[in-house]
């Protein structure tokens, strides 16, 4: 009996010790609790984050600031928010109002493209419907019944920033439920840790808002997981013919596209209410970078000033890319 009592006492002590360790690990302020299965998923960078909602919020660590070299003035910009981030080292090289929520207009189409890529095959057929054409469309030649693969549709979204195509993609990918598509956009933003971001529609004509820091997170995720999305945006001009023999001429809305050495991809945004936005991903010998301008009366001038500032401050040349 005495031996049985000792064994029981030892078992109780072991249970108390294990419980104390669990509570310490669970509630320690310096180590946030993450479910065990989520920890293993965090190491699989090829998995879409939206697959594991909502547990993967803030998986990516915040970008950290880097002091500006002494004697070099900050770039002159008119934007409400702007910044330059080294996506390779995760360093913010310069930023102004990086966490302020600003209207982003058609930068929304980056998230639209990401959600579509994660939830539909490249060969998915996008058919233009009458409901898609009740919005101002860049390409006036689009007609009801025009058919495109999803990859072809991405060219419309990311080169000419076509609004009707964005509506058609969202409607098709979620089987007619555009509201569910927008909900997935917001859930994906939350999973990525984009805490200053909110989407109302897949086009960018509503009150879609984000911040410089959040757009840097999105750009890094796209480049790391779906780099083809940025490659779609790299054409200054593209002639596309559909299976029905219809020809479409797509012109890039980024008018300084060919003036940026090493460019990987870009996306513009503009409405009279929120002003102009421009996100540019480029590569140099020191890594991959993203320049972001939000709410600017001169988005192209601001971006040019940021890139010029970087060339002088970092002693790096923008010539390692395409």
PLM regions with names:
Residues 1-7, 100, 150:
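Structural motif marking the loop-to-transmembrane transition
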Residues 2-7, 17-24, 29-54, 194-195, ...:
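Domain-terminus/edge residues, biased toward the C-terminal soluble/receptor-binding domains
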Residues 11-12:
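Repetitive helical segments and hydrophobic/amphipathic motifs
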Residues 25-216, 220-224, 285:
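Active-site-adjacent loops and short helices of periplasmic peptidoglycan-processing enzymes
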């Amino acid at each position: 009996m005495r031996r049985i009592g000792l064994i029981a006492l030892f078992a109780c002590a072991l249970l108390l010790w294990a419980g104390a360790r669990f509570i310490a690990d669970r509630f320690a302020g310096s180590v946030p609790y993450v479910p065990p299965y989520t920890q293993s998923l965090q190491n699989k960078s090829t998995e879409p984050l939206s697959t594991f909602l909502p547990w993967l919020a803030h998986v990516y660590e915040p970008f950290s600031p880097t002091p500006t070299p002494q004697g070099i003035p900050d770039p002159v910009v008119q934007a409400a928010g702007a910044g330059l981030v080294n996506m390779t080292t995760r360093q913010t090289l310069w930023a102004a109002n990086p966490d302020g929520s600003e209207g982003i207009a058609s930068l929304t189409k980056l998230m639209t493209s990401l959600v579509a890529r994660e939830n539909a095959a490249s060969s998915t057929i996008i058919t233009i419907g009458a409901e898609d054409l009740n919005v101002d469309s860049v390409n006036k030649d689009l007609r009801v019944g025009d058919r495109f693969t999803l990859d072809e549709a991405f060219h419309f979204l990311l080169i000419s920033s076509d609004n009707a195509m964005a509506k058609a993609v969202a409607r098709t990918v979620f089987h007619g439920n555009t509201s569910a598509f927008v909900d997935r956009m917001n859930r994906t933003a939350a999973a990525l840790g984009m805490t200053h971001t909110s989407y109302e529609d897949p086009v960018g004509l509503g009150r879609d808002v984000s911040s410089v820091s959040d757009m840097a997170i999105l750009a890094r995720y796209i480049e790391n997981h779906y780099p083809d999305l940025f490659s779609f945006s790299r054409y200054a001009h593209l002639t596309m013919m559909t299976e029905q023999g219809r020809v479409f001429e797509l012109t890039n809305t980024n008018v300084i596209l060919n003036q940026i050495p090493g460019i990987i991809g870009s996306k513009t945004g503009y409405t009279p209410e929120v002003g102009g936005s421009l996100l540019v991903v480029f590569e140099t010998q020191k890594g991959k970078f993203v320049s972001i301008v939000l709410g600017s009366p001169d988005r192209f001038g601001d971006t040019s000033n940021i890139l010029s500032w970087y060339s002088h401050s970092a002693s790096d040349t923008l010539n390692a890319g395409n």
